[in-house]
Amino acid sequence: MLSYGKPFNFQRWIDEHVHLLKPPVGNQQVWQDSDFIVTVVGGPNRRTDYHDDPLEEFFYQLRGNAYLNLWIDGKRERVELKEGDVFLLPPHVRHSPQRPESGSACLVIERQRPEGTVDGFEWYCDACGERVHRVELQLKSIVNDLPPLFDAFYESEEKRRCPRCGVVHPGKQGRTD
């Protein structure tokens, strides 16, 4: 039995869901309840957090251009994703996807997390590079689990204050370049 249905035209699927690929939703999961989290993410979209995924992530930039800010060895690096590019991100590489172009679309494939495996979400100080805040959770639903975590960070000056230099992270308006 084909529990995920028959083959379909992926481009047509994207066109039919394009209204969900922009703010405030920004993404749409292709299949539910599979071993893979297959998501199409649209732009524009900017993030100030860095995701610490315990597993690999696959990116295929379908339309437009995007980039990943990476946090490696205490410094920010940038990986460009041009239309047509694919990229496999190793586990535990802190990354912050940036999709500045309206109408852009990226296929992102991740594995479902085994029970007890946690994802981390981190924010860094724009002034000195120190990690300001980290939250860990067993990720079950990107749509339901993440907004409360992000809101808790953005709404708390205490959580946004750098422990090293005292500068307050600007929250949603933080650095994304």
UniProtKB/Swiss-Prot annotation:
UniProt keyword list? Dioxygenase, Iron, Metal-binding, Oxidoreductase, Pyridine nucleotide biosynthesis
| UniProt cofactor(s) | Fe(2+)
Q: What is its EC number?
A: 1.13.11.6
Coiled-coil ranges (or none): none
Residues at which substrate binds: 57, 99, 110
Task: Cite the GO molecular-function annotations of the record.
Answer: 3-hydroxyanthranilate 3,4-dioxygenase activity; ferrous iron binding
**A Pfam short name:** 3-HAO
Co-factor note (free text): Binds 2 Fe(2+) ions per subunit.
Could you tell me what reaction this enzyme catalyses? 3-hydroxyanthranilate + O2 = (2Z,4Z)-2-amino-3-carboxymuconate 6-semialdehyde
- What metabolic or biological pathway is this protein involved in? Cofactor biosynthesis; NAD(+) biosynthesis; quinolinate from L-kynurenine: step 3/3
Q: Name the family.
A: Belongs to the 3-HAO family.
The record's note on quaternary structure and interaction partners says: Homodimer.
Would you tell me the protein name for this molecule? 3-hydroxyanthranilate 3,4-dioxygenase
Q: What organism does this protein naturally occur in?
A: Burkholderia cenocepacia (strain ATCC BAA-245 / DSM 16553 / LMG 16656 / NCTC 13227 / J2315 / CF5610)
